[in-house]
A protein has these predicted regions:
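Short, polar/acidic, helix-capping and beta-turn segments at strand->helix junctions
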Residues: 2-166
């Protein structure tokens, strides 16, 4: 299991989740205001190594198995080399969102809005299939294509989320 999954969440007196690992910049990863939880854009960077997730091997085994059920991580180099970056980043980002929401006592069904940024909209169909693992019910959704994302051009997907806890 990689470092990120061994990291503990950092809490502060205001019960705001600051990050999983060290943030890449000086901002809040998430903030709870009453029953609402706002998550900043989540990208597929392991905060312990600051490495961009780009391959199935960057993910834990359970993620690799989940992606196989969707037809990804086939073991065929000619297929995996093209799909792995988008599929692995999609799983990583959505799993981080799930972890943060659950740390605040919620579930993914509490997430009602996602804003998804893509460097290339051709990655959206891959992301959308992976999203169904985490959000089987429809959510309010915005999809935007952007020219670049931080920290580098390997980051293909960024997702903001908003959850409401009843």
């Amino acid at each position: 299991m990689r470092g990120i999954y061994q990291q503990s969440y950092k809490y502060f007196e205001s019960n705001v989740i600051m990050s999983i690992g060290a943030p890449l910049a000086n901002y809040l990863s998430a903030k709870r205001v009453g029953n609402l939880l706002y998550l900043s854009g989540v990208i597929a960077v392991d905060p312990t190594t600051r490495k961009v997730i780009n391959a199935y091997d960057d993910l834990p085994m359970n993620a690799q198995i989940q992606l196989q059920t969707l037809g990804y991580n086939t073991g065929q180099l000619s297929v995996d080399i093209y799909e792995a970056p988008a599929a692995s980043q999609s799983w990583f980002v959505l799993n981080r969102i799930k972890d943060i929401v659950e740390a605040e006592g919620g579930q993914m069904k509490d997430v009602f809005k996602l804003v998804q940024y893509f460097q290339d909209l051709r990655h959206y169909p891959v992301y959308n299939r992976v999203r169904e693992l985490f959000c089987p019910e429809s959510v309010v959704s915005t999809v935007v294509e952007v020219s670049r994302m931080l920290p580098n051009d390997q980051v293909l997907i960024e997702v903001e989320a908003t959850a409401y806890f009843n």
